[in-house]
Amino acid sequence: MTEDETRAELIDPKLRLSGWEMDDAKVNRNFPITAGRIQTGGRRSQAIFADYVLSYKGIKLAVIEAKKADLGYGEGVSQAKDYAEKLRLETTFATNGKEIYSICMKTGREELVDRFPTPEELWNKTFSDQNDWREKFAEIPFNDKGGTWKIRFYQEIAIQKTLEAVAQKKQRILLTLATGTGKTSIAFQIAWKLFKSRWNLNRDGARLPRILFLADRNILADQAFNDFSAFPDDALVRIKPSEIKKKGAVPTNGSIFFTIFQSFMS
């Protein structure tokens, strides 16, 4: 039995039996993790794909590494852990369709299990507390800007971790990202979910949030302002230092404000 046959005849039925591929429980097959590291000369190394990624309520919860039925499940354990680490997932599985080996990256617990967990079981394992804002954020899809933008795995991790911290009422969140990783895109998607879910400091959904995008140069603030064009026009406000000096106050007639640090320096 080939690996493809193992997936179709042994693994897929087990996933369906546990309630996956129903309603909000998604099974992402051959999920692209990375396009491959860029090497000398501009060539890329081999792309990395996970056999399965399980998502529930819009959040990725686990990865599965599949091996063909005549191999031991242990052949996939190392890859299962590696993919879970890359995707920052707490739970991962290695399976040959006959046996299922469960690994918790958080506690280090590893064991053979009789079946895959149901979507609700996996959700409760990952999130021990009930949090309405976590689910509200997850319900808002990413804005793909008319199909011109595709999220990278590390961007999704950054966005998800940030929104989880917001849902947990964390007051300070710091993301450290290298040049070229798409920091503005990450900021856009975070703002998009906050805006669409009507999150605000009162956490009551009664009004839209106010979000400040700060840059150190006007050209960067202008670029960000243009990159946020998917928002309604009346939600975006470009603040110029000269306008603050002239009016003596910061405008508040919007939701997303763009300016430079110097705007707040005397």
Model-identified regions with their sequence ranges:
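Short, solvent-exposed loop/turn elements at domain surfaces
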Residues: 266
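Phosphate/diphosphate-binding loops
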Residues: 95, 240-242
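ATP-dependent helicase/translocase motor core
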Residues: 1-62, 67-211, 215, 219-235, ...
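Conserved motor-coupling elements within RecA-like helicase/translocase cores
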Residues: 242-257
